[in-house]
């Protein structure tokens, strides 16, 4: 059993790896104000960014699904790692050597399964690349690449390799690196043979497939020899780290340019990705042995941000198979907020052939004059009918109308319906528009998938005022229109985000001064962590301690939410300063004092008739002291605390 990672080393990892640098490897982040960043949440499907990152605090929080935590938590959740595995990965990125307690630690045998499988793929990718670069048997592979316009430098840039024809070359090599037969079989790099594991890929050109974080998780392999009875392309089977429906070839190279340009180009094959990138179209990606689908859309959506100017361009062969691929993509188009287009070379060549025949400029030009995908799909349908006859036009409308009816936005649906009428040559445009609208209503009445028109974005990102009021599946339901709750929330945000503005006064506040139970729990967690005063001394460790002191996941999520959420400034307030913080401190304290005054007044009423004179005098004195304190707070503000 692996030893426990030293606490100081865990803290060093948190401090060394900026959370925004880690998160931006998986999604596009933009300025959210107040020093925070925002993006589309990778943990649930959304169209408006409700996921926020606070680089200064080292925390993230989603106001939609309530996921939150620090850098380590993010890596654990997004890559399905244990705590130790996530720390080990981040430590490797930061160059930190970890120390382990409770006995020795043998990395080659005791690391988590995912990390072991990723390590096996990393070593395999390096080995395959070496075989292609120097192995005499790899002449066939090098010739294949050269015939398609790729030199050694291109092969190295994309990590292309070669798997020798023998039965178990890689298997024996990885065994020598300390990997067990079980690990090799689980990784998909080896498969069961008659006498034990053998190489899955033999005599093939190898493309490493990386996840969005850059880890090699699988391979695509192209047949090179006629004697090979296997398929032309062979991919890694689904494993613990590789799901073909959830990976895109080239995403590790293209992600930054996709986010920067708000454009993604989807091609069909590995060589097409290579050709596009070498021609300057560095936003090109491809699926890996499967059709483009919903999980691929989620990956791109996080990078494109659905900001209205995003473009997704599909390039397919001009043959029937390519056209079917385009129409399949259209089935999922409703999940895209980005506008989707298709580009097909006039002569039907794919980007790889186009680059070879006409050069880099032709590839770059391919993705410029593009056709909206819905228009392409409709033209494919319409082309099958004789539009010179009324029967042909009616039949084409019958098939095309349901496609247009699936467009959820009513304005876009109307516009496309008008275009369809023009394609069909039907002069009565309103007839086509009404027919499609009727089909859309029928689909909704039958409980069809998708939201009603113009209701695609009911949930949204956190606004400074409305965001915290959003109902959450796990967090406590609070009516923040209640000014008491709202002020308590702001004071806790200050205590977590700007402790220097409220310390030491805040640490004298009792848990009972917070009337909302979850806020009282957060106040108690802050107290258990050493108070706001500790936050002044060590801001990073302070938030970690507060989260650890939380009694359950609900309170822990609330701590993260309050640490990330922007501080809400009232009208006329220019910034977060001591004056603003003092006002929140005074408001919360005065409300607590007023509640106590009401309680004592009621007690005094009960004692007035037949109470003990000494007790009555004591209660009257307490009431007078509280009234004087309340007056001082009203007249002198924070100075009276």
UniProtKB/Swiss-Prot annotation:
User: What does the record give as the function of this protein?
Assistant: RNA polymerase that catalyzes the synthesis of short RNA molecules used as primers for DNA polymerase during DNA replication.
Q: Which residues form the Toprim domain?
A: 262-346
Q: Cytoplasm among the record's keywords?
A: no
Which InterPro entries has this protein been placed in? DNA_primase_core_N_sf, DNA_primase_DnaB-bd, DNA_primase_DnaG, DNA_primase_DnaG_DnaB-bd_dom, DNA_primase_Znf_CHC2, DnaG_bac, DNAG_N, DnaG_primase
Recorded source organism is Streptomyces coelicolor (strain ATCC BAA-471 / A3(2) / M145)
| Cross-referenced PROSITE patterns | TOPRIM (PS50880)
Relate the assembly described in the record: Monomer. Interacts with DnaB.
Asked if Cell cycle is a keyword of the record, the answer is: no
* HAMAP family listed in its UniProt record: DNA_primase_DnaG
Q: What is this protein called?
A: DNA primase
> Would you tell me the Gene Ontology cellular component terms?
cytoplasm; DNA-directed RNA polymerase complex; primosome complex
Its BP terms in the Gene Ontology are: DNA replication, synthesis of primer
Q: Which residues make up the binding site for Mg(2+) 2?
A: 317, 319
Q: Which cofactor does it need?
A: Zn(2+); Mg(2+)
Show the Gene3D superfamilies listed in the entry.
3.40.1360.10, DNA primase, catalytic core, N-terminal domain (3.90.980.10), Zinc finger, CHC2-type domain (3.90.580.10)
């Amino acid at each position: 059993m692996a030893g426990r990672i030293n606490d100081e080393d865990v803290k060093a990892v948190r401090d060394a790896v900026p959370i925004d640098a880690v998160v931006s490897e998986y999604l596009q982040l933009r300025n959210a104000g107040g020093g925070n960043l925002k993006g589309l949440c990778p943990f649930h499907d959304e169209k408006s960014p409700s996921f926020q990152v606070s680089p200064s605090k080292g925390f993230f929080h989603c106001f939609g699904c309530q996921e939150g935590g620090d850098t380590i938590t993010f890596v654990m959740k997004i890559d399905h790692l244990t705590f130790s595995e996530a720390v080990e990965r981040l430590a490797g990125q930061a160059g930190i050597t970890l120390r382990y307690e409770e006995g020795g630690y043998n990395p080659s045998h005791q690391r988590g399964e995912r990390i072991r499988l990723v390590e096996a793929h990393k070593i395999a990718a390096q080995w395959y690349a070496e075989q292609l670069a120097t192995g005499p048997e790899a002449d066939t592979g090098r010739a294949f690449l050269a015939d398609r316009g790729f030199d050694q430098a291109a092969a190295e840039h994309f990590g292309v390799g070669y798997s020798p024809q023998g039965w178990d070359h890689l298997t024996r090599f990885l065994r020598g690196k300390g990997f067990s037969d079980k690990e090799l079989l689980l990784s998909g790099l080896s498969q069961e043979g008659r006498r034990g594991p053998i190489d899955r890929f033999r005599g093939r050109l190898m493309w490493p497939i990386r996840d969005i974080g850059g880890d090699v998780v699988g391979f695509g392999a192209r047949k090179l020899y006629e004697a090979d009875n296997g398929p032309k392309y062979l991919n890694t089977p689904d494993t613990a780290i590789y799901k073909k429906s959830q990976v895109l070839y080239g995403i590790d190279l293209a992600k930054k340019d996709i986010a920067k340009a708000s454009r993604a180009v989807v091609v069909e094959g590995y060589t097409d990705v290579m050709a596009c990138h070498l021609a300057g179209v560095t936003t090109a990606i491809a699926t890996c042995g499967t059709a483009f689908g919903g999980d691929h859309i989620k990956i791109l959506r996080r990078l494109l941000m659905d900001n209205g100017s995003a473009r997704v361009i599909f390039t397919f062969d001009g043959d029937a198979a390519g056209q079917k691929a385009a129409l399949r993509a259209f089935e999922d188009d409703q999940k895209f907020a980005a506008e989707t287009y298709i580009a097909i070379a006039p002569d039907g060549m794919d980007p790889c052939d186009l680059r070879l025949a006409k050069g880099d400029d032709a590839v770059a030009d391919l993705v410029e004059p593009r056709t909206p995908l819905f228009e392409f799909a409709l033209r494919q349908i319409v082309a099958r009918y004789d539009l010179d006859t009324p029967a042909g036009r009616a039949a084409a409308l019958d098939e095309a109308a349901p496609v247009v009816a699936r467009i959820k936005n009513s304005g876009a649906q109307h516009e496309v319906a008008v275009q369809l009428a023009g394609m069909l040559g039907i002069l009565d445009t309103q007839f086509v528009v009404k027919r499609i609208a009727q089909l859309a209503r029928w689909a909704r009445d039958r409980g069809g998938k998708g939201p009603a028109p113009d209701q695609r974005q009911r949930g949204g990102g956190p606004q400074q005022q409305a965001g915290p009021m959003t109902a959450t599946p796990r967090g406590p339901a609070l009516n923040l229109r209640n000014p008491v709750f709202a002020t308590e929330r702001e004071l806790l945000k200050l205590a977590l985000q700007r402790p220097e503005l409220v310390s030491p006064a805040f640490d004298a506040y009792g848990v009972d001064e917070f009337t909302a139970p979850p806020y009282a729990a957060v106040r108690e967690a802050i107290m258990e962590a050493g108070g706001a005063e500790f936050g002044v001394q060590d801001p990073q460790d302070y938030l970690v301690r507060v989260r650890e002191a939380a009694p359950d996941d609900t309170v822990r999520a609330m701590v993260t939410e309050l640490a990330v959420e922007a501080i809400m400034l009232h009208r006329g307030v220019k910034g977060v300063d001591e004056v603003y913080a003092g006002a929140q401190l005074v408001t919360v304290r005065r409300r607590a004092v007023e509640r106590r005054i009401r309680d004592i007044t009621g007690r005094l009423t009960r004692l007035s008739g037949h109470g003990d004179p000494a007790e009555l005098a004591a209660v009257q004195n307490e009431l007078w002291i509280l009234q004087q304190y309340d007056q001082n707070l009203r007249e002198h503000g924070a100075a009276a605390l």
